[in-house]
Amino acid sequence: MANSSAGSAADHRNKHLSVNPPHQIFKDIQGSDNAIPLSPQWLLSKPGENKTGMGTGDPNQYGNHSDVVRTTGNGEETLDNLKKKDVFRPSLLDAESGRRDRWRDEERDTLSSVRNDRWRNGDKDSGDNKKVDRWDNVAPKFGEQRRGPNDRWTDSGNKDAAPEQRRESKWNSRWGPDDKEAEIPRNKWDEPGKDGEIIREKGPSLPTSDGDHYRPWRPSQGRGRGEALHNQSTPNKQVTSFSHSRGRGENTAIFSAGRGRMSPGGSIFTSAPNQSHPPGSASDKGESGPGEPPHLRYSRMKLLDVYRMADTECYEKFPDGFIEVPSLTSEEPTDPLALCAPSSDEVNVLDAIEKGKIVSSGAPQTSKDGPTGRNPVEFSQPRRIRPAGSREDMTFGAEESKDESGETRNYPDDKFRPEASHEGYAPFRRGNEAPVRELKEPSMQGNAHVQSASPWRQSSGGERSNRNSHDWNDPSADSRLKSSDSVWSHPKDSINHLGGNNMMLPQSKGESRWQISEDPSLRRQPSLVFDREQEVRKLLPSSPEELSLYYKDPQGLIQGPFSGSDIIGWFEAGYFGIDLLVRLASAPNDSPFSLLGDVMPHLRAKSGPPPGFTGAKQNEFVDAAGTSAFPGVGKVHSGMGETDMLQNDMRYKHVAGTVAENRFIESLMSGGLTNSAQGVQGYGVNSSGGLSLPVTDGGADMYLLAKKLELERQRSIPSPYSYWPGRESANLMPGSENVSENAQQPTRSPSSDLLSILQGVTDRSSPAVSGPLPAWSQPIQKESDLHHAKTFQTQIPFGVQQQRLPEQNLPLSGLLGQPMENNPGGMLSPDMMLAAGLSQEHQSLNLLQQQQLLLQLNAQTPLSAQHQRLLVEKMLLLKHQHKQEEQQQLLRQQQQLYSQVFADQQRSQQRFGDPSYGQLQASLDALRLQPSKDMSQVNQQVQVPVSHEERGINLADLLPVTHATNQTVASFETPSLHLQNQLFGNVDPRMVLPDQIDDTHKKESKSEYERTVSADYVNSLYSEKPVLSPGYHATHNVEEPVSYPNNESSTATMTAPEIVESKLLEEQSKDMYAGKGEVSIELSGETPATEVKNNDVSVARKTSEKKSRKQRAKQAADLAKSTSRAPLQETKKPQPGSADDSEIKGKTKKSADTLIDNDTHLIKSSTATASNTSQMSSEVDSVRGEESSLQNTRTQPGRAWKPAPGFKPKSLLEIQMEEQRVAQAEALAPKISSTVNSVGSAAPWAGIVTNSDSNILRETHGESAITQTGVVKPESVPTLKAKKSHLHDLLADDVFAKSSDKEREVMEIISNNDAFMQVTTTNAESFDDDNFIDARETKKSRKKSARAKTSGAKIAAHVPAVDTSLQTNSVEKGKSSRILQQQEKEVLPAIPSGPSLGDFVLWKGESVNNPPPAAAWSSGPKKSTKPSSLRDIVKEQEKMTTSSHPPPSPVPTTQKAIPPQAHQGGASWSRSASSPSQAVSQSSSQSKSKGDDDLFWGPVEQSTQDTKQGDFPHLTSQNSWGTKNTPGKVNAGTSLNRQKSVSMGSADRVLSSPVVTQASHKGKKEAVTKLTEANGFRDWCKSECLRLLGSEDTSVLEFCLKLSRSEAETLLIENLGSRDPDHKFIDKFLNYKDLLPSEVVEIAFQSKGSGVGTRNNTGEDYYYNTTAANDGFSKVGGKKKAKKGKKVSLSASVLGFNVVSNRIMMGEIQTIED
């Protein structure tokens, strides 16, 4: 029966697959009498059978299955029903599988054509049914829901790998009473729709042949859950089911039946999803499939019947050749999910699946992304994340390679995935399962970054890597896997360390790994790797298609021989992955099986993970396949973190693991990696160890060797760097060897030096770089390396650092990842960027200490505390010594390097010399391409790995380094000219590298040497400002400056350099992307001040360091702006050479613009960096003094883009500090009140600010730039302005480019509205100052936006205004603008375009200038403005209306005066700025009394117009009201500007602001004020109702006004809660309800009918107004209802009728209204 079924099915379906084992398996699976019909073991046997059944014995399966089913008591449902079910079920399953497969096909183009066709042909039809079946298990929606989950698994599986894994495991288990999975998952799934599903399975007899044939493969990967089982191709797919406990039984059979794809892992994973289909279902499908051998697929019903009818104990016997894998199998049969109540986790998952929250197993499925599976990024990113868990990451790399095949992953996933997927499903995995789950959980911990599925996968991946490589190769591998599971139980812990420490725990990892490696499977794996490698070599024929291969299915059964073309076809069809264990038919029987990817490396590029799994990226495959492998070739540059690099390396290593392992072992033998063995264990597991790990196949032995060697060496080498070396050496050696024999050696040499230095094995690593490095003394190299490593470490965030500490090895691994680029530090650069702000030195020490401790604790637990202490002490001593030696030697050597590099840099600068970033980028790209050359050269020239790495550094690293150096030079050198345009072009990255090296070393070892170097170097740079380019000249002169530092030490200057260094670190990455020169220019401009203010600089440095940390988030945005503007400012700064600076400004603008044109992204990055630097510079400058501020006053054509959105506000402390500094700096130059000139500009800015922060910033920056450039403004003014508003300038700078154009337009508008703008700005400024404080209050978001607007305007105004108050304001502006921008970014989107309660509140606040506005609700200290205060305010407003000009005269008068005079605005600004609080209090009291009420509910003009103009213009028509001039109106204008910012352009705001002022003049009586408030409130309610309910019917709101707050809140939540999930509107409304006087509320809705009747459908409104006048409720409810023409009766209910009220309260009003 098995044979016949196998014959027919295999012939029909698995044309190339011999499914004899499947026959056997099918036999087991055929009947419930089989020992393990539903158990995972049964499923596992079933895979072989499924192969038979699916491939050959599908009809037999059905026949057998029918028999079995009949035997189980499904006689009626036996073959016929099964066929029906199977036909239907297979269709569903096939469809689902097909969908997964289809994803897989999509993932794999080759598969997609076949599978998609198949799926389209039969899978579609049956797929839905199939899904129904599956869903039957889950819910009444049998077909769709079930399928939906699969689809989700398939579709979303990629998104949610972990959920899908869980889900798949559940599906798999639910398909059969897997011992583990079936318990709950299966019961869970089966129970809900087991009957329906069975019926579906039986009933829908969709032509399974169609679906089955094309689905089978797809299911193995795409279906991932029972689908694969159902696909006839599924046998292969189901082969994957073996690995998963989920669909184990069915998929397993299919797997064994499945084609070679059933190779360990890939097909297993694939089958795991497939397994989700009940084996019977698969049989049914196969049976139903015409011409298809009845697969041993039971419909769920039949499976359940089998389960019910058969004694599960009889199935406890495992099929012959069945390998018990704890993670995949349970000692005892598990109840089908249909029979078992799902666990709470399962229930949650099921619910989530039904709700669509979980659309996939959560496994990183790449099925959607193409044959390879996902975007390489998709999978690599989880992997990328994985670097944390070196094992898993490494294994994950291997795993990914396997994932490429999909089956490898699937299989290990089956083992681990169940764990992972079952992590939440403990019941799924009983017994052994738990350890793996635990393992995976640690793995997940380590790889928390990775998708949840990815983490478990990682853990399983480690296992899988081993197992996939070998265990998966053999049935014995499974046994090993079992033992491996035990081992992995250890690894579990180790993985916890691995994942948790992210390769920092070489010991825990290493021990676990070593345990694992000690574990037979692990031990076996290394040899397997070698054997496989050898075998692969043996196996590889001239033409893969010509090969005759046996493959080992997950059952461990040898299938075949099959032609290579068949194997390839199956592989492409997704039946198995590159991890399929194959052996040449001609190979001896005892010859080891090799991975298909090894035998057919070209398939690696094609291999894709199962649909539910993120497959290794094609890059990985390429890397794996082309073990040449620059895993980071594209990926490192693609911005992968070192983690990604690690993953790439791991990937690569896994692929190239055999070769790399050999090399690694050789290196270990050579001792080069001896310490790296620790790295191998700790990080190496991910890095070099990871190389071994991914290569865990041979890595276990390597790790053992490395571990022993490393431990011995590390023990022998107390220096903490021995640990570093271990890690880095591991990284370097394995990475270098793995990644590139070619490019990696040069990369390696610096890395080796680094590693050796870190390891204390300088000689060891230096030999790699022996040729070029000899120039450098080992100690120096060591120091450089140490510093470089530190830099990398410090650059690396600590969170990342743990991952990276191993990944610090990533610098090495980066080398590995970047060997292509020979950019050992290339990967680090991102980290460097990340940690740039951190004190490199401290970070380095901390990292070294932490890493060393971790390494010692983890990898070298044997090390005694003394050793650890010694290591730490030695590390510190070494660090100190290295600092000193490095300082000295690096100074000398760097001088040499600088001389050498300078020539190189000149050449390279000539290469890069083009100021344009595009060229620079090209040059950088060239550097990346040239790194091997340059790297070798640099390595030769500069042993300091930093140099090498920097040269080889990725663009990111190179740029950051270059920026750092350039910035350092720039900071030290005033010539911002050179830096701006020449930073990239002129400064050779290599030159920069030496500088950066100096900086880095200085940073790392903040010895006086660094300080001296920094100070003296800076001084020399200053003296050398004429240098063509800071980089060039600096580098050129660096030799001298370096010697200077050696001889000289100006602590103060040094402090500035340190600050600069920290900045540079930040800027390095930042400038790296943006015009490096700009930031450098900024710094260079600052340098004199730095020297001048050494103490300040020290403070500033500290502050900068703090900020750098704090600002990192906002540095990106701020520095982006700062970079744009700071360079401009520097250019503008006439410090050392104002002419040059101005030239630079032009150049910078060009350069910045060019950079923008060339690489906006880089510009953004550099801008962000520059912003940070600029902020830091501003701080430093403020600290340093006026000169600094002047220098900082650089108007750089900021980047066109707006970094503001990403801009992160500084902490209040930072802001306060900045304000203080700015205040000081501005106080130094309060003289510049002439900045009023820019106030005119600023006025528009106020309007623009309301428009958008970026606009404000842009325009403000443009304004400041314009003011500086075009407006009559002393440079001291720009300086002060820049200093004051440096932060906002930073924000505005990048905007400047855009803003300059916009600004010109705006300036024209401003010129027209200068006075008003100034007034508005003044109000905004005053308001903003308070807003800055009060903006965070209850109306925080609104105030944020308003504040952002006003603050933007204020900033714009402040930029021009140089008053101390303005300066402080500008500081606050900068801060508040940043905050406001952030807040506004947060808030503005939420701000309704029309008048909103927030707008009213904001207007109030703005009009009042934050303190009063805060009172609007309870948000501010000004809460006094509550109903009573509103009334008072109304009265005051009336008074103010009558005498509105005088009361607000302080601000408004100025404003009035200002409108005519943009420059006089300075006075008003001075006035408001000098006493913003006074102006605020005045205008706030005045405009609050009047404007607040008006503004609270809307612009005062609105009320006025409503009363006077009758046509109450909306906010968008504020220009109408804008004609009114009243301080209150000005405030209103400000608020209006805010609203306009939401809805109107800056021009409109600008125009409307004066108009608003006029509107204020129209004066309003208290009634008018109340009416205005009422109208504003009503309009706001309408707008909100329209927004939330889609209609202006405010009946609910009116009714709520009649209710108590709690009742109203309840009602509103009932009615609007779904539409206002955040309850923002509800809260606002309730606040208004509480704050508004009852009369205002009455007026609001009466006026709706009457007062605003004309506006609000007067007829109805009046009609209801009469009613409203007579009856409040009638008025309230009836009016609005009447307006709608709906709910008139409802309005009656609104009037208070309980029935309707209850309905309303029930939220039915909305329904009724709708």
UniProtKB/Swiss-Prot annotation:
GO function term, MF aspect, one: translation repressor activity
Gene3D superfamilies associated with the record: 3.30.1490.40
Composition bias type Polar residues, residue spans: 58-75, 230-244, 268-278, 444-463, 737-753, 1163-1180, 1515-1544
Residue spans of biased composition, Basic and acidic residues class: 96-136, 143-203, 389-422, 430-441, 464-483, 1142-1162
Chain positions found as Phosphoserine: S39
Assembly information from the UniProt record: Associates with eIF4E initiation factors and the ribosome complex, thus likely contributing to the proper translation of target proteins. Interacts directly with RPL18B and eIF4E1. Binds to SMG7.
Stated role: Translational repressor involved in the negative regulation of immune receptor accumulation via the inhibition of nucleotide-binding leucine-rich repeat (NLR) receptor mediated defense. Represses NLR protein accumulation (e.g. SNC1, RPS4, RPM1 and RPS2). Together with SMG7, helps to restrict effector-triggered immunity (ETI) cell death induction during pathogen infection in a salicylic acid- (SA) and reactive oxygen species- (ROS) independent manner. Required for pathogen-associated molecular pattern (PAMP)-induced suppression of necrotrophic fungal (e.g. (Microbial infection) Required for early steps of plantago asiatica mosaic virus (PlAMV, genus Potexvirus) infection. Facilitates pathogenic growth of avirulent hemi-biotrophic bacteria P.syringae pv. tomato (Pst) DC3000 (e.g. AvrRps4 and AvrRpm1) and of the compatible oomycete H.arabidopsidis Noco2.
Classification of source organism: Eukaryota, Viridiplantae, Streptophyta, Embryophyta, Tracheophyta
Record PTM text: Quickly phosphorylated at Ser-39 after treatment of seedlings with the pathogen-associated molecular pattern (PAMP) flg22.
Tissue: Expressed in all tissues, mostly in flowers, leaves and stems, and, to a lower extent, in roots (at protein level).
Protein's name according to its UniProt entry: Protein ESSENTIAL FOR POTEXVIRUS ACCUMULATION 1
CDD domains, A to Z: GYF
